[in-house]
Amino acid sequence: MKVFKQQLEQLGAQNQYRSIPDLIHQGRYITRENRKMLNMSSNDYLGLASDENLRRSFLQQYGGNFPSFTSSSSRLLTGNFPIYTDLEELVAQRFQRESALLFNSGYHANLGILPALTTTKSLILADKFVHASMIDGIRLSRCAFFRYRHNDYEHLKNLLEKNVGKFDRTFIVTESVFSMDGDVADLKQLVQLKKQFPNTYLYVDEAHAIGVYGQNGLGIAERDNLIAEIDLLVGTFGKALASVGAYAVCNQVLKECLINQMRPLIFSTALPPFNVAWTYFIFERLPQFSKERSHLEQLSAFLRREVAHRTQIMPSQTCIVPYILGGNEATLAKAEYLQRQGYYCLPIRPSTVPKNTSRIRLSLTADMTTDEVRQFAACL
């Protein structure tokens, strides 16, 4: 045990030690250590997680005859239920694509997709700032990979040109909305690049965009009218949609490859049908939340301006607003100060973000009021 204790002590000395907090949730507020705070760190972007009317409508819809609370098995064995197919068909229909496939989480999706669709003769080109789950999936793929500079498409093009004809297939991998900086990939440029090179596929993670952007809440790909051009469009139900699980939208051939070769799908007990039914209920209503999306954008634009006055770096274009302070100690101190003022703000440190870019990741939700965000900005 000595070596493990030393590792923990080293993390503590670097202000990188983590622990799981004890929290009580009350709508958009969180209570921690008897301190009630406005939650400025949530991914509940549309504010649906605590919407009692939605919850009541969902429960009344089933009248006590609820779907099973467990699947008890992988979908490929005895764990498949009609509600899974219903949701996949709904997702595919809304995206106007051939097929969709459900996963237990965004992490499961990103961990398993690339290993299932690549060989040792393949190439992966990933944005430098893609999520840790995508990096883990890339590592498990056991194929060649390079990380192009963040949103630097000249660098990406250079890598594509250097590797023409060397691999059986190439995957370009990116997020649409980046989870730590809140900036947005140029999907149009990525689609254009993909088309210039043979056997090249585009894989976009919309975890922080689904529900929030696009006329129907289908993400940046919908906003930019590019859904049909993206080979693998992945998103999560656990953020703006206030549920659990994830999906991939793709063609039928890729779906069947994933069903046959994706280990996290094949060897995991499927999500409880009850949760999938709740996801269906929310996803079906996604186009109806345009007022929430509009209000969230107004709040986000205001907070981005306020934070930009106080930091040298403001990459955000979304409701994820990084307040970059640099060092771990300063970031921890600022987070503690804001919590004392009644705002649940959390420090983000390396290795989650690059060294010397420690920050408070501010995340807005549509159930916040304009006055609440103004008062928070004054505390900064």
From Swiss-Prot:
Pfam families assigned to the protein according to its UniProt record, in alphabetical order: Aminotran_1_2 (PF00155)
Binding residues annotated for pyridoxal 5'-phosphate, in chain numbering: 106-107, 179, 205-208, 236-239
Listed name of the protein: Putative 8-amino-7-oxononanoate synthase
Keywords: Biotin biosynthesis, Pyridoxal phosphate, Transferase
Modified residues (N6-(pyridoxal phosphate)lysine): 239
CDD domains, per the entry: KBL_like
Subunit annotation: Homodimer.
Family membership noted in the UniProt record: Belongs to the class-II pyridoxal-phosphate-dependent aminotransferase family. BioF subfamily.
Cofactors that this protein relies on: pyridoxal 5'-phosphate
Enzyme Commission (EC) number: 2.3.1.47
Catalytic activity: 6-carboxyhexanoyl-[ACP] + L-alanine + H(+) = (8S)-8-amino-7-oxononanoate + holo-[ACP] + CO2
InterPro entries: Aminotrans_II_pyridoxalP_BS (IPR001917), Aminotransferase_I/II_large (IPR004839), AON_synthase_class-II (IPR050087), AONS_Archaea/Proteobacteria (IPR004723), PyrdxlP-dep_Trfase (IPR015424), PyrdxlP-dep_Trfase_major (IPR015421), PyrdxlP-dep_Trfase_small (IPR015422)
Enzyme class: transferase
Any one Gene Ontology BP term: biotin biosynthetic process
Binding-site residues, substrate: 18, 131, 352
Record-linked PANTHER family: 8-AMINO-7-OXONONANOATE SYNTHASE, CLASS II AMINOTRANSFERASE/8-AMINO-7-OXONONANOATE SYNTHASE
One annotated GO molecular function: 8-amino-7-oxononanoate synthase activity
